[in-house]
Regions:
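Inter-lobe coupling/hinge segments of SF2-like helicase ATPases
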Residues: 1-207, 217, 267-272
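C-terminal accessory region of SF2 helicases/translocases
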Residues: 190, 202-292
Length: 292
């Protein structure tokens, strides 16, 4: 589960637990490499594209930082209705002031004394002790905290149906799949939910998040921007070592190659026929390069 959270080496070790095991991978936000493997025919795909009963689509907006206080007013309106909200920041601590980003703890402290004075606010980040993180998250899940200011530590394993609004600061610093994963922390109940991306740059790139909730379409855009990485190596992004082919523009050719490979392996699964010696040697060299 949450396949995108595992590195290439980790997934390979899991697959080696048995002898040629069947492997089922699940993710709402496939990484570019996964989408590339689907295109290459290494993975079969099943898509569950229906919302669970009672849930509504999440509305997503992109705003300029100048409109942040209007967004805060929108959040307070929902807090006053008894709902809960997230504000997500890219930084855990100070040290990146040159990037114009604010430490999540200082940011939360400022919110408590200014815009959200009188509201119950908590902070959550990855450098907290496990017991502290668990306590903070449990308090939020129980409805005792109204607003949770957090880093991407909330990206996975958080299910609070009463949380209906998420504001993401410096949205341009997150990957598309990561933004989609974060957005999935809201809209888990019956309330209409809203995700607000605060940024003053990369509007074209982020517009795909606004326009779709389809994880595969978002992964496809990520694939165009980041590249799929190595298919047989450990890099999960970057351009593959293809001299002529383009995996996005040559999908029809890839499908022909998939069908030809399937027919060949049906006829000669172990590539033992003399006519396949050269192909077998090339495949072995490819696997040796990747240490498979």
């Amino acid at each position: 589960d949450e396949q995108h959270r595992f590195g290439v080496g980790q997934r390979l070790k899991l697959a080696q637990k048995g002898i040629n095991p069947h492997v089922l991978v699940m993710s709402a936000t496939p990484i570019p490499r996964t989408l590339a493997l689907i295109i290459y025919g290494d993975l079969d795909i099943s898509v569950i594209d229906e919302l669970p009963l009672g849930r509504q689509p999440i509305k997503t907006y992109i705003i300029n930082p100048a409109k942040r206080h209007r967004a805060f007013g929108f959040i307070k309106k929902h807090l006053d209705l008894g709902e809960q909200c997230y504000i997500v920041c890219p930084l855990v601590e100070q040290g990146d002031e040159d990037l114009g980003l604010e430490d999540v703890r200082q940011y939360a402290k400022r919110l408590c004394s200014e815009d959200f004075a009188g509201y119950s606010v908590a902070v959550l980040h990855g450098k907290m002790k496990p017991s502290e993180k668990e306590k903070t998250m449990r308090t939020f899940a129980e409805g005792k905290t109204q607003l949770l200011v957090a880093t991407t530590v909330i990206e996975v394993g958080v299910d609070v149906p009463n949380a209906s609004v998420m504001l993401i600061e410096n949205a341009e610093r997150f990957g598309l799949s990561q933004l989609h994963q974060l957005r999935g922390r809201i809209g888990r109940g019956s309330c209409e939910s809203t995700c607000i991306l605060v940024t003053e740059s990369e509007l074209d790139r982020l517009s795909v998040i606004k326009s779709t909730s389809d994880g595969f379409k978002i992964a496809e855009e990520d694939l165009k921007l980041r590249g799929p990485g190595d298919f047989f190596g450990s890099r999960q992004h970057g351009l593959p070592k293809l001299k002529i082919a383009n995996m996005l523009n040559d999908i029809n050719l890839l499908k022909l190659a998939q069908n030809a490979a399937a027919s060949l392996l049906y006829e000669d699964p172990a590539l033992t026929m003399e006519s396949h010696d050269l192909l077998k040697s090339a495949v072995q060299k490819l696997f040796e390069r990747a240490d498979i």
